[in-house]
């Protein structure tokens, strides 16, 4: 039986991930780190309310085998590039550092297609920097998931709905098949499946088609 940590449990992908972990017989404990208490209750669920800005909240955590980080925001929601960087990079890395100090062997990071720390595009660059920060911590096993457009269902943002509509039309005529939208529920399922199937120590980088092929 495995024990999991989750950061970003209230986002679209994180919510789906937590629900699936709770229903997975391979997991005995699911620890979520959130800013506010959750309404969800389950025998396996352990909720840790933390202050992202309090270093003492991020020293060590309960014993676990794998940590999943699904945290992320948008520039619009954050209000500035500095604030978005704080969420997408700094908060995720302090979570990863706590996991490493606590003896967690596997770290699974939800990144994005095109993540590159040297990119001229801010969003791609911060995703790449988050990956590099996690990589430098030297987990026994690291999985980077780089999906393209996420289908959040009713939670989808306007620009995401437009992008998905265009991409689906292109997919139907045989174009950009590797960049088809992926539902957050399917992504969460593949993150759990990837952690279970890719057992050898090392680093795994999974882009759109590789995610679906797990």
Regions found by a protein language model. Name each.
Residues 2-24:
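N-terminal Rossmann NAD(P)H-binding glycine-rich loop of SDR-like oxidoreductase domains
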Residues 4, 39, 46-94, 98-101:
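NAD(P)H-binding glycine-rich loop region in Rossmannoid oxidoreductase-like domains
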Residues 7, 33, 70-71, 107-113, ...:
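SDR active-site strand-loop-helix element
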Residues 26-28, 117-214:
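Oxidoreductase cofactor-interface core, primarily capturing Rossmann-like NAD(P)-dependent enzymes
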Residues 31-39:
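Short, polar loop motifs at secondary-structure junctions
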Residues 44-46, 142:
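Short, conserved active-site loop motifs that form the nucleotide-linked donor/cofactor pocket
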Residues 81, 86-131, 136, 140-145:
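Conserved Rossmann-fold NAD(P)-dependent oxidoreductase catalytic core, especially the SDR/UDP-sugar
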């Amino acid at each position: 039986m495995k024990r999991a940590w989750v950061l970003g449990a209230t986002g679209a992908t994180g919510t789906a991930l937590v629900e699936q972990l709770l229903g997975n017989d391979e997991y005995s404990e699911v620890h979520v780190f959130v800013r506010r208490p959750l309404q969800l209750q389950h025998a396996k669920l352990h909720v840790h309310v933390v202050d992202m800005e309090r270093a003492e909240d991020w020293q060590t955590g309960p014993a676990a085998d794998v940590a999943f980080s699904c945290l992320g925001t948008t520039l619009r929601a954050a209000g500035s590039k500095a604030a978005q960087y704080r969420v997408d990079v700094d908060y995720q890395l302090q979570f990863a550092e706590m996991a490493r100090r606590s003896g967690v062997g596997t770290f699974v990071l939800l990144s994005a297609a095109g993540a590159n720390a040297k990119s001229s595009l801010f969003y791609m660059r911060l995703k790449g920097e988050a990956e590099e920060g996690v990589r430098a911590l030297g987990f026994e096993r690291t999985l980077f998931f780089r999906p393209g457009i996420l289908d959040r269902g009713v939670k989808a943002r306007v620009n995401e709905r437009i992008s998905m509509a265009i991409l689906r039309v292109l997919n139907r005529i045989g174009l950009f098949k590797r960049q088809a939208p992926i539902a957050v529920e399917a992504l969460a399922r593949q993150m759990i499946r990837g952690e279970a199937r890719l057992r050898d120590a090392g680093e795994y980088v999974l882009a759109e088609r590789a995610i679906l092929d797990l």
